[in-house]
Structures are given as structure tokens and as C-alpha cells.
Curated annotation (Swiss-Prot):
GO terms for cellular component: plasma membrane. It is found in: Cell inner membrane. Part of the tripartite ATP-independent periplasmic (TRAP) transport system DctPQM involved in C4-dicarboxylates uptake. This is C4-dicarboxylate TRAP transporter large permease protein DctM. The chain crosses the membrane at residues 2-22, 50-70, 82-102, 104-124, 139-159, 172-192, 217-237, 243-263, 289-309, 326-346, 356-376, 380-400, 417-437. Pfam families: DctM. GO terms for molecular function: transmembrane transporter activity. Keywords: Cell inner membrane, Cell membrane, Membrane, Transmembrane, Transmembrane helix, Transport. The complex comprises the extracytoplasmic solute receptor protein DctP, and the two transmembrane proteins DctQ and DctM.
Length: 453
């Protein structure tokens, strides 16, 4: 009964418009004061232990910073040019190229909203200019942008790993095949639609242009090799990889592509050495750091408050009670996965993915292990649910971002995204009930998962 009161408090605060993070934290603290023997001092200790013990969480601000430099520094337009050169000549080629571009940018950013902004701000206008409807373009980008949290490196995967003590490296590998499969399913759906509606296709630009586009995009795409190669080559940890990614992104944006900073100013005739020094204090660098800082603070504030709720649930032994009741009821793996999907699909409509994972993952993880479900399989399934949550109202973040980028009303974006959500639901069913899609690559490259019960 007391736990029901806690969730009523959380949901009630959200309904009256209290920000999600404050709803989680304030309701948990009020519950502690009224119904629990735990003290507020224990909350502070739990928060300290959570952040001190999860070195992995340090990767989040660095991945966000890398993503911001990549978005600002002209990487997106070079990736789009490369994607159009490769697949633009198919029927519906611009839409297909936008999905390919989202997949490639997802491998650099780890963030869905960043992918929508970076790719959508360029591609949507281009698609409309070439005969596509704005609704079609917005729907494709809104859904393809969700690949930002599925294709590694992914900020949401880092949060899941921190919440469940699962290897980040395994999670990243687990997202490769599902990410490619999701992109392929969207591409097939677009191609079929393009054939039916006779959508336009671009002329083949020739291999010379394709190679030139590949060369220009290679500096940005090399970041994927550095991150994943460094992690699986044992050169650095995921957190160190994130820091390297941030530095590399800064270097590429300022000194190679020269789309920001003093080198972007063609009228600046100062010596090269002076420009290099100015880069570190230039207004573009400051603006990028500010944007990354704002996003990091917002995300970490949500995670911190979600950790308070997690602490309360742990103090009240809720995970153990749920595990015992489900197992005693004879709940099998298939039924359990259906229940988890339903919880996440509903929760994902109202909460930011990272905060929801911090709360739900520790609750369902012990049950999954007891039922013999692979932690990587569970994690990827949860991430896919978060993808769908980002494109469903009322709080789907990608819907709001797409609305701003495409300059469309929220309701029109929801209608535009709806047909493609069906593809994502089909993909969720595949990921849920075909475990090897998520587990094959991690097992192949890192051996079988060792689980300590």
C-alpha cells in the first residue's frame, strides 16, 4: 500500500506539470519522511555511492560533448552527401539516404535528438525541394533518428550498464546487429512505399563523386573505429573512449573540416599558431561547450533523481518482492518479456529514457536472470522500447525535436511518424523473441556471458 502511494505521488506530480526529475526526487523524499525508517542522510550516501561507484557514468558528458562538436562541425552534411552518393539513385533514394545518414551519425553521437537535429535540419528541406511531402520527410527522420540510442556508442546503453553492472563493451556489441536490422527494415519499408507512390529518385552521381564524398566523410566516420576499436582492442575503457571521442571531435570540427572556430572565418588573416590558440577560447567553442553542458546537467539531474527513487524501492525490498511474486506465480520468460515491454512502452511515453531505465532495469534484472534471460538481450530490448517511447506522444522527445526542425505542428508530426512506428513495433517483436539478434556478436567476439546469481 505504501509503495502504491509512492507511485501515485510520482504520477500525480507529473500530471499537474511538475518536471519529471523533480517528481521522481521529491516524491521519493516525501515518502522517506512519511513511511520509511531510512533517513535523508542515507539518500545522500546512496547518491554519492552511485556516482562514485559508477565510473561508467562519466562517459555520458564526454559522449554528449563529442556529439555536440560533430553536430556543429559540419560532419552531418558530409555524411549526407556520402549517403546520397551511395543510395540516392534508388526509388525514394533521398529518404533511404536519410536513414543511412542517421545510422552513420548515430554511430558518432549516441543520441537520438542530436541525430534528428543534425540530419533532419539538412535532409527535410532537401527532400521537400525534390518532390517529397514534408510529412513524409518528417516521419522518416523522426523514426530513423531513434537509431541514435541503438547503434553504438549509445548514452542509453551506458546508463543501462551502470544500473545493472553489465559490461558496456558487450552492450555496444549487442546493439550492432539490431541497429543494422532496424535501419534495413526502415529502408525496405521506404523502398516499398516509394515504388507504390512513385517517389522520385536521384541520378547516379558517378564513382568519382562517390569516392570524393567517402573521403570527406571518412574523418568523421573514423571516430567509430577509434571508439569501438579502442574499447575492444583493450586500449582504453568505454569512459576513456568517450573522452578520446570528445577531443577527436573538437579536432575534426576545428582543424580538419574547419566549419567552426577561427579557421572557419575566411577573412581571418592571423598566423596559424594564433588561430590554434584562439580556437580554445573562440565563441563557437564556448557555445558548443555551453550547449553540451546544458544537456549534460539536464540528463544527470534526471538520473540523480531516478537514483533516489531506486534507493527508496531498494530500501522497501520492492525488487525482491516482485521477483518472488512473479516466480511463485509461475511466470515464464515469454510472459515476463511481454510484461516488461508493456511497462516500458507505457513508461516511455511519459519519461526520458535514461531516467526510466535507472528505475526499471534494477527491478526487472533479477527476474530476467532467474528466468535465464541474457542481460544483453534484456538491455537491447529495453533500448528498443525507449526508441518507440521517443516517437510516441505525449512526451516523445523526437516528436518535439522533429516539430522544431521541420517547422510543423506537434499533431502533424505525430501523424507523419505513425506509419513508421509500425515498423519499429515489428522490430521490437523480433528483438524480444529472437535473442541471438542481440547476443550473437558479443558472444562471438567476447565469449559467453558469465552471470553470477
Amino acid at each position: 500500500m505504501a509503495v502504491a502511494l509512492l507511485f501515485i505521488l510520482v504520477i500525480g506530480m507529473m500530471i499537474v506539470g511538475v518536471p519529471i526529475a523533480i517528481s521522481l526526487g521529491l516524491s521519493s523524499i516525501l515518502f522517506l519522511l512519511w513511511h520509511s525508517d531510512a533517513s535523508l542522510a542515507s539518500v545522500a550516501q546512496t547518491l554519492f555511492n552511485a556516482f562514485a561507484g559508477h565510473y561508467t557514468l562519466l562517459a555520458i558528458p564526454f559522449f554528449i560533448l563529442a556529439s555536440t562538436f560533430m553536430s556543429t562541425g559540419g560532419v552531418a552534411k558530409r555524411i549526407i552527401r556520402f549517403a546520397i552518393a551511395m543510395v540516392g539513385w534508388f526509388r525514394g533514394g533521398l529518404a533511404i539516404a536519410s536513414v543511412v545518414a542517421c545510422m552513420m551519425f548515430a554511430a558518432l553521437s549516441g543520441s537520438s535528438p542530436a541525430t534528428v537535429v543534425a540530419i533532419g535540419s539538412i535532409v527535410i528541406a532537401g527532400m521537400v525541394k525534390n518532390g517529397y511531402s514534408k510529412e513524409f520527410a518528417a516521419g522518416v527522420i523522426c523514426n530513423a533518428g531513434t537509431l541514435g540510442i541503438l547503434i553504438p556508442p549509445s548514452i542509453v546503453m551506458v546508463v543501462y550498464s551502470a544500473a545493472t553492472n553489465v559490461s558496456v563493451g558487450r552492450m555496444f556489441l549487442g546493439g550492432v546487429v539490431p541497429g543494422l536490422l532496424a535501419g534495413l527494415m526502415l529502408i525496405i519499408a521506404i523502398y516499398i512505399t516509394a515504388r507504390i507512390k512513385n517517389l522520385p529518385k536521384q541520378p547516379f552521381v558517378g564513382w568519382k563523386e562517390a569516392l570524393k564524398a567517402a573521403k570527406e566523410a571518412s574523418w568523421g566516420l573514423l571516430l567509430v573505429v577509434i571508439i569501438l576499436g579502442g574499447i575492444y582492442g583493450g586500449i582504453f575503457t568505454p569512459t576513456e573512449a568517450a573522452a578520446v571521442a570528445a577531443v577527436y571531435s573538437f579536432f575534426i570540427a576545428n582543424f580538419i573540416y574547419r566549419d567552426m572556430g577561427p579557421f572557419a572565418d575566411k577573412t581571418n588573416t592571423k598566423p596559424v599558431l594564433v588561430k590554434v590558440v584562439e580556437t580554445f577560447v573562440h565563441k563557437d567553442t564556448k557555445a558548443t561547450l555551453y550547449d553540451a553542458g546544458k544537456l549534460t546537467i539536464m540528463l544527470m539531474f534526471i538520473i540523480a533523481n531516478a537514483l533516489i527513487l531506486k534507493h527508496v524501492l531498494t530500501e522497501e525490498r520492492i525488487p525482491q518482492m516482485i521477483t518472488e511474486s512473479m516466480l511463485s506465480a509461475g511466470l515464464g520468460p515469454i510472459t515476463f518479456l511481454i510484461v516488461v515491454n508493456l511497462i516500458l512502452l507505457v513508461g516511455g511515453q511519459f519519461m526520458e529514457p535514461s531516467g526510466l531505465l535507472v528505475i526499471v532495469a534494477p527491478l526487472v534484472f533479477p527476474i530476467a536472470i532467474a528466468l535465464g534471460i541474457d542481460p544483453i538481450h534484456l538491455g537491447i530490448m529495453m533500448v528498443v522500447n525507449m526508441e518507440i517511447g521517443m516517437i510516441t506522444p505525449p512526451v516523445g522527445l523526437n516528436l518535439f525535436v522533429t516539430s522544431g526542425v521541420a517547422k510543423m505542428s506537434m499533431m502533424n508530426v505525430v501523424k507523419a511518424a505513425l506509419p513508421w512506428v509500425g515498423v519499429m513495433f515489428l522490430f521490437l517483436i523480433i528483438v524480444t523473441y529472437v535473442p541471438w539478434v542481440s547476443t550473437w556478436l558479443p558472444t562471438l567476439l567476447m565469449g559467453p556471458e558469465i552471470i553470477t546469481r
